[in-house]
Amino acid sequence: MLTRPARILRQGCLTSGLLFSGFLSFLSLPVLAQDGAYSEPAGFAECKARLQEQAITAGVSSKTASEVMSEVRHLARVIELDRRQPEFTTTFADYLNRRVNDARVSKGRELLKEHQELLARVTRETGLPAPYLVAFWGLETNFGSYFGKMPVPSSLTTLACDPRRSTFFTEQLIAALRIIDEGAIPADQMEGSWAGAMGHVQFMPTVFLKHAVDADGDGRRDLWNSLPDAMMSAGRFLESMNWDGDYRWGREVLLPENFDYSLADGRRLPLEQWREMGITDAFGKPLAREPINAALVVPAGHRGPAFLAYHNFRVIMGWNRSEFYAIAVGHLADRIAGAGKLQNPPPEDAPALSRANIINLQKALQQRGYEPGNPDGIMGPATRSAIRQFQAANNLVADGYPGESVLAALEIPAGQ
């Protein structure tokens, strides 16, 4: 396992959501034959050769391409992790509690003060408020304490040679080789997540190439060892997605009794219209009269918190296309800036659905004439829309959430 350069900042400690370092070293091991020697799956060598030629054609130097690709190994564990995405089965309560907790809030506030000069510079140049920058940093790498230990060239080659998302990861691999080619980091030090995300803010290689900057003036775009480079790059990336510095990400709100939860379907309405429906802020005060649109989000259904998501919520989702993630970033930023906990925390007893649960739910909806999309075990917009329609037709709260009442009505055991 490669040793990380000494310059890397190491604030904070690993959270419960991260794996023990000994196990992590196992994750990066290649496929081994019975005698312990490295063994590649059939066709992998040919795939590597094709990718090397593609990289050279795309402008990577022959020297870099050949040297890096000669050291690439197939990582079977990467394929396993690519097939198993925990975002699909965790509850909102579990997700939020793991990512926005007192320890992380306290550390974030400490770092907000420690790096106030740097963060103020990033805010001046990009428009990104400091608490959001620190929140992204906290969620991505626990404030720089863990960047991932997978060898990025090997991870990306493994994924590029897998047919499921070959085109996407081929592009990422070529971008990673270009990053090495420009001298940002030596190939043997390019470590990251199993999917190839790198550095303090976990940029994918294509995002790195387009948005990473040299903010400390040392001639390199170094997102591993330079916090100025990492923070400014994060600011530039979010700025490129039209972050609106005049408004926050959104806010927790209170809904009136007998509210029509079918409105929480992604539609964006003027804030004044939500106000006229009786929605208030989390403390019962009237919403501000601002000329902006917002969408209502109820990530844990009608039993959990409700949020009005503004334009910047969509910008956050441009970084990570998960509503859970976007809420976590916004809420953590609020907490770091001094706000308190949610007024209506998510229910701890919500059922945690497996892929099998969701597939059975999707099939049950199909059998009843609804259109949840292909039964793939993913709670996407089509599935939520079908749930909402089923709920409305069966006198259930139409929040689009697969709670116990929906599972019972569809005769699906929660533990199935």
Model-derived segments and their meaning:
Residues 42-62, 66:
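Mature N-terminal segment immediately following signal peptide/propeptide cleavage
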Residues 33-41:
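Cleaved targeting-peptide boundary
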Residues 1-10:
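N-terminal secretory signal peptides that target proteins for export/translocation
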Residues 47-54, 118, 155, 361, ...:
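A general alpha-helix detector
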Residues 12-30:
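Bacterial N-terminal signal peptides
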Residues 410-416:
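Intrinsically disordered, low-complexity Ser/Thr-rich linker and spacer segments
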Residues 353-358, 366-410:
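Short acidic, glycine/serine/threonine-rich helix-capping segments at coil-helix boundaries
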Residues 38, 60-291, 304-307, 315-333, ...:
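Catalytic glycan-binding domains that act on GlcNAc-containing polysaccharides
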